[in-house]
């Protein structure tokens, strides 16, 4: 089911490409056509790609050579993945980071750049339209203090960051 929902999200993103491109262009100044053909199209392709991998995650039973002994791999989600994105191609970043997190069964908290937050907010709404469960994708807004609080939160299990070198240093503390 998860694969179908993430694939549906890719389709919904494609259906709303003009709207998403207009939002991103209004905030970062990149021409709408470039945003539509590059960022938004890549966002949908990334989601399609990760949706196709959902049924391929697994492990191997490794023979141990000892009677009655069993060795196995159990793939489990991390839990909550924080996704911090930059202002220049927010749609591309969201698709490339949220896609694998959802594909592996994680919940996501997206913290977009304060300079380009509208695409992430609309993405979260489109997640609901595509059928993702409530709470699977969340968006928090704010500056560095919000990002720092998110990264330091004990309920956040993994962090994916794209941004400046200085901001990266802050995130990695």
Model-found features: residue ranges?
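Glycine-rich loop-to-alpha-helix module at the N-terminal edge of alpha/beta enzyme cores
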Residues: 1-57
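Rossmann-like NAD(P) dinucleotide-binding subdomain of oxidoreductase/dehydrogenase enzymes
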Residues: 59-173
């Amino acid at each position: 089911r998860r694969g179908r929902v993430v694939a549906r999200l890719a389709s919904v993103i494609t259906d709303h490409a003009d709207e998403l491109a207009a939002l991103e262009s209004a905030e970062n100044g990149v021409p709408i056509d470039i945003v539509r053909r590059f960022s938004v199209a890549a966002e949908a392709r990334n989601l399609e790609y990760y949706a196709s991998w959902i049924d391929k995650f697994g492990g191997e039973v490794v023979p141990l050579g000892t009677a009655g002994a069993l060795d196995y791999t159990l793939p489990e989600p991390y839990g909550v993945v924080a996704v911090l994105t930059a202002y220049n191609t927010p749609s591309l970043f969201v698709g490339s980071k949220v896609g694998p997190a959802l594909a592996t069964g994680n919940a996501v908290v997206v913290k977009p750049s304060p300079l380009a937050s509208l695409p992430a907010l609309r993405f979260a709404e489109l997640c609901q339209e595509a059928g993702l469960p409530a709470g699977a994708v969340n968006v928090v807004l704010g500056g560095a203090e919000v990002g720092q609080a998110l990264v330091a939160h004990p309920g956040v299990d993994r962090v994916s960051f794209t941004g400046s070198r200085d901001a990266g240093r802050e995130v990695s503390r």
